C-alpha cells in the first residue's frame, strides 16, 4: 500500500492549493482526481472560467462557434498549467481515478488499469458539487437536454433555448445565450422570481432579461419531457413548449455518494453534504472537507478561504475559522452583472435595525453613458445608529469589481461616509459610490 502524509481527493481550488503548500513544507502528498478533464477543478473546467469567457464573447457578439473554440483554448491552457503546477513538483503524486473510503486512513482508487489502495495520515476532501437533476419523466433520456457542462460544449447555437430553473445559473445562461442570438425561455416552478433578492432588484433584472428577448414563465410545473421532430418538448400543467435545447439549472448538490464516506465514519447531512465544524474537521479526526462538498456557499473564493483555514491549522497558529468570514459578496454575470454583499432591504428591516435605503439609477452615472449601458440600479442599506453599511445590491456594468470596494469598507466597520467622500478616478463606475452614498441623509 502506498503511504502518504496527506491525501487530497479532488483537484479543486482548495485541494490543489493545499497540495502545493504541503509539498513545499516537505510533506509527501497524493492528489486524487477522477477525471483528467478536471485538473484545476470545477471553476477552471466547467464553471467560472468557461462561462465567463463565453459571457464576454457574447457581449462582443462573437460568432458562437468561434466563442466555443476560444473558450476551449482558455480552458485547455489553464487545465494544463494547473496539472503541471502539481505534477512537476517533488513530493506530489497526481493519481487519476475514483476514490472510495475503505476506512478513515485507507482509500481504494478505481482505475481502468487496476485498482490502487493508498494510506493517508491526513485526508482532505475537495470533490465539489454536481447538478441536481429533478425527477421529471424523460429528463435523463431525452436528446437535447443538458446540464451546464453539456451546454458549454454545444457545436452550434440553439435557435430556442429552454432553461429549467430561474435561479442565478439560469439567469446567467439566459443572458449569455440571448446575447449570442438565441431565443430563450426560463421555466421557473416558483411563483416568485429570484426570491433571495429584493423585489425592486429582481424586477429590474426581469426587465433587463425581457428587453433581451428572454421569456420568464413562473409557476411552470413541468410534468414530463419528450422529443419530437428534432425538438425537446416540455410538457407542463397548462402548456407545452418546444425548444431546440433544454438546460437543467435546478441547482447543485455536494458530490459525495461515490466516496462512501460512511466507511470512514464521516457524517453527511440530508443533502449529502459533509458535516464539518468551524475549522472544517469532519466527524473523523484525521479528515477535513473543503469547498462545495461541505454544502456551504458554492464559490471558488470560499474554497480558497477554506484552504487558508486548514493551512493555518496544519502549518500556522490554528486561529482561523469560518467564523472569521464577515461579508461574502457574490456576482451573477448576466449583462449587466448583479453583485451583492450583506443584507437585502427586507433582511435589514426584519432585523429591527433603524435603516435608510438609498438608490441611484445607473442612467445617472457618466461612465455608464460612456460605455453605452445605462441599465440597472445601485442600492445600499445604511444603519442610522452606527452609520455603517448593512448591505448593497449593484446591478450595473462593472458591478463585479465595485462590490469588492463596498465589502472591504463593511468588513473594516467603517461608516458609509468613507465611500461618500472617497477620491475615485474619473470617469469610472466606482465613483458612482460617491453619488449613491451622498443620498444618505
UniProtKB/Swiss-Prot annotation:
Active site residues of this protein: 426
Name assigned to this protein: Probable pyridine nucleotide-disulfide oxidoreductase RclA
Cofactor(s) needed: FAD
Family: Belongs to the class-I pyridine nucleotide-disulfide oxidoreductase family.
Pfam families: Pyr_redox_2, Pyr_redox_dim
Cofactor stoichiometry and binding remark: Binds 1 FAD per subunit.
GO biological process assignments: response to hypochlorite
Gene Ontology MF terms: cupric reductase (NADH) activity; flavin adenine dinucleotide binding; NAD(P)H dehydrogenase (quinone) activity; oxidoreductase activity, acting on a sulfur group of donors, NAD(P) as acceptor; oxidoreductase activity, acting on NAD(P)H; protein homodimerization activity
InterPro entries per the UniProt record, alphabetical: chlor_oxi_RclA, FAD/NAD-bd_sf, FAD/NAD-binding_dom, FAD/NAD-linked_Rdtase_dimer_sf, Pyr_nuc-diS_OxRdtase, Pyr_nucl-diS_OxRdtase_dimer, Pyr_OxRdtase_I_AS
Disulfide bond annotation, renumbered to this chain: 43-48
Highest taxon above the source species: Bacteria
Binding residues annotated for FAD, in chain numbering: 33-43
Gene encoding the protein: rclA
Keyword Membrane: no
Additional remarks: The active site is a redox-active disulfide bond.
Mutant lacking the gene: phenotype: Mutants are more sensitive to HOCl treatment than wild-type cells.
Keyword terms: Disulfide bond, FAD, Flavoprotein, NADP, Oxidoreductase, Redox-active center, Stress response
Function (record text): Probably involved in reactive chlorine species (RCS) stress resistance.
NCBIfam families: chlor_oxi_RclA (NF040477), PRK07251.1 (NF005572)
Induction and repression of expression: Induced by RclR in response to hypochlorous acid (HOCl).
Amino acid at each position: 500500500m502506498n503511504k502518504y502524509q496527506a491525501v487530497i481527493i479532488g483537484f479543486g481550488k482548495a485541494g490543489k492549493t493545499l497540495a502545493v503548500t504541503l509539498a513545499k513544507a516537505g510533506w509527501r502528498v497524493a492528489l486524487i482526481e477522477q477525471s483528467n478533464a478536471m485538473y484545476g477543478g470545477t471553476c477552471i473546467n466547467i464553471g467560472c472560467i468557461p462561462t465567463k469567457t463565453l459571457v464576454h464573447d457574447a457581449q462582443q457578439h462573437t460568432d458562437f462557434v468561434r466563442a466555443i473554440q476560444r473558450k476551449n483554448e482558455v480552458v485547455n491552457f489553464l487545465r494544463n498549467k494547473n496539472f503541471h503546477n502539481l505534477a512537476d513538483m517533488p513530493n506530489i503524486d497526481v493519481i487519476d481515478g475514483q476514490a472510495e473510503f475503505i476506512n478513515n486512513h485507507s482509500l481504494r482508487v478505481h482505475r481502468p488499469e487496476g485498482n490502487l489502495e493508498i494510506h493517508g495520515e491526513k485526508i482532505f476532501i475537495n470533490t465539489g458539487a454536481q447538478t441536481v437533476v429533478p425527477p421529471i419523466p424523460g429528463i435523463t433520456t431525452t436528446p437535447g437536454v443538458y446540464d451546464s457542462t453539456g451546454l458549454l460544449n454545444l457545436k452550434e447555437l440553439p435557435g430556442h433555448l429552454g432553461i429549467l430553473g430561474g435561479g442565478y445559473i439560469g439567469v446567467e445562461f439566459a443572458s449569455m445565450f440571448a446575447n449570442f442570438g438565441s431565443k430563450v425561455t426560463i421555466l421557473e416552478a416558483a411563483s416568485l422570481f429570484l426570491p433571495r433578492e429584493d423585489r425592486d432588484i429582481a424586477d429590474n433584472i426581469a426587465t433587463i432579461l425581457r428587453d433581451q428577448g428572454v421569456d420568464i414563465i413562473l409557476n411552470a410545473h413541468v410534468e414530463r419531457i419528450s422529443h419530437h421532430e428534432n425538438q425537446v418538448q416540455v410538457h407542463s400543467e397548462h402548456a407545452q413548449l418546444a425548444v431546440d435545447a433544454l438546460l437543467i439549472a435546478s441547482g447543485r448538490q455536494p458530490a459525495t455518494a461515490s466516496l462512501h464516506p460512511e466507511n470512514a465514519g464521516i457524517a453527511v447531512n440530508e443533502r449529502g453534504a459533509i458535516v464539518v465544524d468551524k475549522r472544517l474537521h469532519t466527524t473523523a479526526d484525521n479528515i477535513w472537507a473543503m469547498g462545495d462538498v461541505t454544502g456551504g456557499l458554492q464559490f471558488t473564493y470560499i474554497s480558497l478561504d477554506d484552504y487558508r483555514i486548514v493551512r493555518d491549522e496544519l502549518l500556522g497558529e490554528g486561529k482561523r475559522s469560518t467564523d472569521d468570514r464577515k461579508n461574502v459578496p457574490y456576482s451573477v454575470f448576466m449583462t449587466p452583472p448583479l453583485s451583492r454583499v450583506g443584507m437585502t432591504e427586507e433582511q435589514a428591516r426584519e432585523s429591527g435595525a433603524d435603516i435608510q435605503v438609498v438608490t441611484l439609477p445607473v442612467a445617472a452615472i457618466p461612465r455608464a453613458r460612456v460605455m453605452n449601458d445605462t441599465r440597472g440600479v445601485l442600492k445600499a442599506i445604511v444603519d442610522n445608529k452606527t452609520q455603517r453599511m448593512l448591505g448593497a445590491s449593484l446591478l450595473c456594468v462593472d458591478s463585479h469589481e465595485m462590490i469588492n470596494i463596498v465589502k472591504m469598507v463593511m468588513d473594516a466597520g467603517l461608516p458609509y461616509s468613507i465611500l461618500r467622500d472617497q477620491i475615485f478616478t474619473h470617469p469610472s463606475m466606482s465613483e458612482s459610490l460617491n453619488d449613491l452614498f451622498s443620498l444618505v441623509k
